[in-house]
Amino acid sequence: MIKTGRLCLSMEVIFFMAGFVLMGNLPAEAVPLREKAQLTYAPEVPLPIARKKPAIVEVYLDSAVKVMDLGPNVKYQFWTFNGHVPGPFIRVRVGDTLEVHVTNSDESGMPHNVDFHAVTGPGGGATVLTGVAGEEKAAYFKLLHPGLFIYHCAAPPVMDHIANGMYGLILVEPKKGLPPVDREFYVLQSEIYGKEPMEGQEVMEFSHEEGLKEHPRFVVFNGKTGSLTGEGVLKAKTGERVRIYFGNAGPNLISSFHLIGEIFDQVYREGDLLSPPARSVQTTLVPAGGATVVEFGLEVPGSYTLVDHAIFRVEKGAAGFLQAEGKPRHDIYVSKDDPEPCEGCLVHP
């Protein structure tokens, strides 16, 4: 028993002890599972959680500035998590303890942090994860609610950090997991507010003023125009069941998510995985800072288009494609004419 002085513990020891506390009242012989999160980047999704017990799940996020393609002949200086926009998809289980390590590699000196909408507590964790350049912050959070949640940087001014690319999705599976499907995809919508590029200017500059007006220059899926076209097209086969984890980082607009040519068989609105899903939905609203899970079967081969059905946004980049391969279904979809090419059309390839 220590009566005087200080007990100095390493960060590793403190985290190990904290992990035991957050895992609950465990029997003496029980040792909590520990694993490193298998992070993926859009449109890829980590494999479903196979274990049946809670674990301490390590997540490592690095904030850095990176110039990347935004559209044809347009680059943008993004603020990123792990060098990607959107940031990584994190998959955990309700009852898990999230061990988060956040490193600030932004050489500008700007502070960064993470607000997890899945975390219960002040700032969603942001209040204890704020770090300046070269600093690493870490914390433990027990995940009490299943669902699909946004996470984003919340350092001031928070709207600038979100608008510049610091966001991602975290899936907290229910204890019994989710029903199996054949394919899962990660799609996140966001807006880019930029100044009119000057002649010869390759990198578009961010405009806080355009953000205040809510006039985005681009509305995109997965960080850039055309991310789900060409080589980035989502691929599946007829007869398969598809699940899309869809988020809306905003920072301003509501998304009217729609898949041209299909009906969502099930929609877990606003990322709610506890209530029975809505069924046979044509278009679902996804608020800024929110998410949804949609599931559907593919009966007919062909190209299907993901859009924000606030349809003028298609011209700003909010369109992508899912290609379904398989045998024709003339009992469902038939015509004496072949499909005609849609020259200059943004919603049909």
Regions found by a protein language model. Name each.
Residues 20-32:
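Bacterial Sec-dependent signal peptides at the C-terminal "C-region" and cleavage site
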Residues 10-23:
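Bacterial N-terminal signal peptides
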Residues 29-349:
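Copper-binding active sites and cupredoxin-like electron-transfer domains
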Residues 1-7:
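N-terminal secretory signal peptides that target proteins for export/translocation
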Residues 9-11, 26, 336:
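Compositionally biased regions
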